């Protein structure tokens, strides 16, 4: 927000405060002033000149020889190259000795043999940004109104002795996106009064309602719409003071009618729009939602395709403007416009924001509607605009307005105690001082025994709770005045929760196993949201109300899809060996209207080589057992390995023969496996394995305690066993049966071979186990080991129908 220091003085008396002092004070009150710009940029010696004579240069067709009165004893001759120079004009003249931006000094010169005693200036040459110069003067010199005094300071007329404060407003302070809002802020800081604009509106006997009717179909999106007629306007330039104020605010002057709507926007923060009444095509205004695919050509000469949630202003059939964003070219005010219909409305910020984003079209008006405007200024703004059009465009303001008013402006009362204010701020401000601050803020209030009941004006939508009032007191008191104190109270030593400790263990182990941590988006697209879920969920994923894109429109139900995107991205860039893991949240949908259930999961993906450096030995490709080994090591670290089993599973998107559920105490908590070949093809990856499991359920299980034992002094005995079983037999279940049957002497069971070759019967396979027997107190005898081993053989024969392989 650019704030003209001189313009601001019209609303609050700050003549005793310099612009820099004001900037410092505003910054200390909580609104950052990013800079103060002096508009004249060091320019000196530029005056108003009157062109007495103008003729072609005898030696150059594109130059003119001018005799110009600059308010001195004798007129001066100046050679000018501007195409729009002419006799009788009043123009800015840089005299000999004048200084222009960049410390450029004007000297006497000869141009093609003719003397030149000065320079006729364009606005750009006086330091004004070319983007802010009206089209009329974009390629030529500036021309003053005919009543400009010859010899007067041109910079004063152009308001270039002004200073502009640039405010860096946060989204909650939309009330300062206009001059009156800033005036209220400055008045509160200095304890002064705000002088509101005087509206001198003379209306004709004719009524606006005789020319136009207004109806609103989309009442929720447009609760208030006001229209007013101004007839017989004469389009021309706006007054100089208005043009200079608009340029200081960063707005290019266009014409008197358009400039007035922009001026009101900057003064009140109320966006207005002016229609050429004679181009409307009907005598009615209908505000409705657009039809899907409806077309409109906007003021920037672009054809826009509308969607059904966009709000439009129509003549009953055809769209005339995109509400709150931009007007239509068909009803644009031009030099031929005679009758003007002014619009002042309150459009829902959410609707305007979505429309603006969809169309890729952002304007000063849309920015203010998005952040929220003061609905109580809507009528005052349109009346002031009509008065200015009557005065500066020669128009006739018709009596009254036509409105569709469904707006319910509810009074907000927020209460706070003086005790709370002082407790939160660490101050000792009296209740009377606080009352003075609320008075300076123009917040009506009542006080009962130290409790303030504050009626918050509509211009301050950011004040909703007592803490907001505490902030207002703190801002006006001055944060730099709050006394410095040491921390008080009991110091509590921080520590990690059990879940935090376990998460650190997970990260430490997986990184030690060669996986890199990834952090992916919690948002995903509709087609990926339900992929690779640990538990099937029939409810629809949670949708964002206003997603930035379709790719990030739903909350994820699995971590795997985003990790696969990361793998695909790496593989496409020739990084073929990737091992990633993520600890993150998924969002399980609940009943309609309730918040989703957030649950912490662990997921990982591995592809390419597991070992690929020479010092690690032979290269090893990632397979099911490599990934399973990583998980088994993790479960050992977490103390739940004896409670974990694996069960073959068929899951969508996973390889049907290389996928298993991870089961904890009989409950499926995750899965592990290889991607389905079709999924690998879509991602353009090969040999890719994934896993995902619920950390909530793992952490919620009591971990086995870790015991330490002395290094054994007695030897152990090893027996191997190869048995033939059906292909459906699970090695993990057999290993568990062997461990139970072997008793206390059997300390370790390892599967070291799986054979399914030509020599095996159809439907059979061979499993080979190595069993280690040991007693820490003595040396075992062969008979003791044989007895335990026979129990193992008997158990697997009875349980699985196993036969010793011969």
From Swiss-Prot:
Which compartments does it reside in?
Cytoplasm
Free-text comment on the cofactor: Binds 2 magnesium ions per tetramer.
Its predominant location is: cytoplasm
Record flagged with keyword Ligase: yes
Catalytic reactions of this protein:
tRNA(Phe) + L-phenylalanine + ATP = L-phenylalanyl-tRNA(Phe) + AMP + diphosphate + H(+)
Please list the residue ranges annotated as the tRNA-binding domain. 40-155
What's any GO biological process attached to this entry?
phenylalanyl-tRNA aminoacylation
Q: Which InterPro entries match?
A: aa-tRNA-synth_II/BPL/LPL, B3/B4_tRNA-bd, DNA-bd_dom_put_sf, Fdx_antiC-bd, Fdx_antiC-bd_sf, NA-bd_OB-fold, Phe-tRNA-ligase_IIc_bsu, Phe-tRNA-ligase_IIc_bsu_bact
Q: Which CDD domains match?
A: PheRS_beta_core, tRNA_bind_bactPheRS
Binding-site residues, Mg(2+): 462, 468, 471-472
Q: Where are the transmembrane segments?
A: none
Query: Which GO molecular function annotation, any one, does this entry have?
Result: transferase activity
Q: Where is the FDX-ACB domain?
A: 712-805
Record has Cytoplasm as a keyword = yes
Q: Where is the B5 domain?
A: 409-484
Q: Which GO terms describe its cellular component?
A: phenylalanine-tRNA ligase complex
Could you tell me the keywords of this UniProt record?
Aminoacyl-tRNA synthetase, ATP-binding, Cytoplasm, Ligase, Magnesium, Metal-binding, Nucleotide-binding, Protein biosynthesis, RNA-binding, tRNA-binding
Which cofactors are named for this entry?
Answer: Mg(2+)
Describe the protein's quaternary organization and the partners it interacts with.
Tetramer of two alpha and two beta subunits.
PANTHER family the record matches: PHENYLALANINE--TRNA LIGASE BETA SUBUNIT, PHENYLALANYL-TRNA SYNTHETASE BETA CHAIN AND LEUCINE-RICH REPEAT-CONTAINING PROTEIN 47
Q: Which family does it belong to?
A: Belongs to the phenylalanyl-tRNA synthetase beta subunit family. Type 1 subfamily.
- Mind telling me which NCBIfam families this protein's record contains? pheT_bact, YtpR
Name this polypeptide is given:
Phenylalanine--tRNA ligase beta subunit
